[in-house]
Amino acid sequence: MDTMQQIHDFMIAEFASERTSFTPDENLLSQGIIDSLGILRLVTFLEERFDITTTDEDLVPENFATLTMIRNFVEKKRGA
């Protein structure tokens, strides 16, 4: 399963009560799907699943607003 699909599946399981999918560029923050506590849950998942480490500086909306941004963040961290 690719990175985007794993992130998508986690988001559906954890944050979507009545939805079955998100589009890659749907803004999860502005739509209220994920909030600051949700970002912390997401970060924990990303660190465990993809064996990455995040810093306080990483915790900005630009890294977590959409599935595409989350995937890009993970790929950047994995390449670092």
Describe each model-derived feature in a short phrase.
Residues L40:
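Conserved catalytic core of two-component sensor histidine kinases
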Residues Q6, N27, M69:
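Residue-level recognition of oxygen-bearing side chains
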